[in-house]
Amino acid sequence: MTDTLLPAAPQPLEKEGNCYFRKGCNPLAQTGRSKLQNQRAALNQQILKAMRMRTGAENLLKAATNQKVREQVRLELSFLNSDLQMLKEELEGLNISVGVYQNTEEAFTIPLIPLGLKETKDVDFSVALKDFILEHYSEDSYLYEDEIADLMDLRQACRTPSRNEAGVELLMSYFMQLGFVESRFFPPTRQMGILFTWYDSLTGVPVSQQNLLLEKASILFNIGALYTQIGTRCNRQTEAGLESTVDAFQRAAGVLNYLKETFTHTPSYDMSPAMLSVLVKMMLAQAQESTFEKVCLPGLQNEFFLLVKVAQEAAKVGEVYRQLHTAMNQEPVKENIPYSWASLACVKAHHYEALAHYFTATLLIDHQLKPGEDEDHQEKCLSQLYSHMPEGLTPLATLKNVHQRQLLGKSHLCQAVTHHEESMREASLCKKLRNIDVLQEVLSAAHDRSQLKYTQLREDDDLLNLTDAPDIVSKTEREVEIIVPQFSKVTVTDFFQKLGPLSVFSANKRWTAPRSIHFTAEEGDLGFTLRGNSPVQVHFLDPYCSAAAAGTKEGDYIVSIQDVDCKWLTLSEVMKMLKSFGQDDIEMKVVSLLDATSTMHSKCATYSVGMQKTYSMICLGIDVDDKTDKTKKVSKKLSFLSWGTNKNRQKSASTLCLPSVGVTMPPVKKKLSSPFSLLNTDSSLY
């Protein structure tokens, strides 16, 4: 006899005052960041439409045999390619819109580059999860409508996270919740029929898969992107703000590096291993730049040892940006990295190399070795400043000879002016960088300062006497490093914990439907012993006891006693409950573990518009009928994202039948419709 398991008196998941429900930002707020994200969503749709039209035109060109038709199609293809190029340039403009994310109090600092959040489409979990709960766990799916709707609300809230630690915790909580969902509802032998669609943040190309790994990888990318936006928002005019900036970019690098190492075959350009490696380098370069700004924040005194330190710190920043620019110009990254990003990396490389030469020139020209000063220390610092001294010069002789110091200092000034001019030229070649006023002002001011100092010292025979300035050895007191994400610090409650302990009740294990066992304890003896802990398992069963006669088997798991859910009860609690009935009849429900059948894994197709080469995830292929009926609950609670129009979320009916015998469904409680609802759009509002 089989029954449907009805969890009696389930423990509520709601924790009032414990931040169980989290909200995203108001998608209707017309902030600069929300407008930018709305433009990104609109551009994604335009790019998708243009790519579909181009694909259709290419197919028509292959199929057409009429020469006149082929010429018309070629003309249309040229227009479509032109439109796509313009759309990609618009998307690049959004990716370099650094002014929106910068702190408003910053007046004279070079902007940092944040990453934009990946966009997605709405996903309906309800039908697939309800079917799986009925089929796999043999439980009534209506009991889990609240939990399914909570999961969908949490996903919707993650589309508009706030730009602070609360937003990071929101994304991390959903990422960890996906781990629970994957273990409970995504078996390794089949697909669930839930299609996840995410847009590439750099190209706008959509990627769709029936694979939860795409969802998890995209959420990780957005966590890293959110850290970059937090870093650019910090006030870099204060020491605490700069420290927060360094920390945020190090954490962003850690998340992106974790994504690269964990999800190695992601089907999106922005999450490919090569692109992620470049993005990690960019985050660390910006963290190193903020470290240099922190050194310079108190003001630079015209002191020998301090100038040596600052020169080497600037050389370090220039070095990491030079390496970043080289990485951005390698295939296959070069094709998809925004040109303005690569240009800005080159600009910063020249700018900070120029600063290193300027500070070196200052310490050589403005200082002389005086009696009583630490001669050995200055000699050591100067020797460590260069990998090798210019031919014919020694550190100590240079310190003592004013003329040699002047000549070497002017050589560094010439080199500084050259790098400044190159940085300004590179910035002028990029239309997006020309529109960043603060960048132009900083580059111009630095160039004028070096040019003025050289003009004051220039002599007619400098072209004959000056030698090439040696390269400055890069050195930093604080080497920035990747901070590994710590997901364990975010406390998450499994939405579907009523299904039982995850170690036992998971998608990887197949179970029989619950069987009702009616028996009595003869003279206080149950006829079996118990073992295990949450859930309790039948052990050492007496084949002649009443429980065995009623159908109990050794190894069965006890899931309920007298309609009281026992999946989370300990052995002592279950034994105490059984003993409490004495000689009375006991109704116990048990389930048995079925042998797992091995299934050969197959690859599923990745739908990616316009991607000639794609990284394909391994997932499992079966035919799944399209489910178009979107279902949502009428929640007793406010949704995670409680802005929008008044639309009630309707409950959906499952497509599977309950394996129940003589079980009466309890009356459905009437729920009050929420005055708020999620905005249901194809692209997220931000």
UniProtKB/Swiss-Prot annotation:
GO terms for biological process: glomerular filtration; negative regulation of stress fiber assembly; signal transduction. It comes from the Eukaryota. PROSITE patterns: BRO1, PDZ, REM_1. Residues 26-100 form the REM-1 domain. It is found in: Cytoplasm, Perinuclear region. Disulfide bonds: none annotated. Belongs to the RHPN family. This is Rhophilin-2. It comes from Bos taurus (Bovine).
